């Protein structure tokens, strides 16, 4: 790995993980962060993989710089979700959506991969949010952690996202008080 890139990404990861209290990271069972390059899952280049059994977050330091900070929180949410599926219930989450909407069967069997924020949200922040419920939750969480003001503005105009944001915030509060 290029030392300059590694140092830069290490700084970004440290800065973003320092937002979380140590006690919270213990509660969600995150112990290790592994940095790698050119990470793939099912032939798709991916930004990160949460390994729940090993309590590890694997992050690709070469992943698109534009999304890198958000990716850290997105993957942290997968660790949270895996340890607190009862708090972040996917059926309750899915009920927030328009009744005509259906998620894909799995995130890797969907071509909904875009990570850019929609101009018109209609209940979803990104194309990737539309893949499966857990990815939708992770996208909402990642934007909440990196741009609270933008999320507040979006929530004021999008009632579906308002409900999703409140659901995530309340779930995180439950874990902190756990």
Predicted regions located by residue number:
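Charged, low-complexity surface segments at secondary-structure and domain boundaries
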Residues: 1-4, 151-153
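Zn2+-dependent metallopeptidase catalytic core
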Residues: 2-29
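Active-site-flanking segments in enzyme catalytic domains
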Residues: 28-178
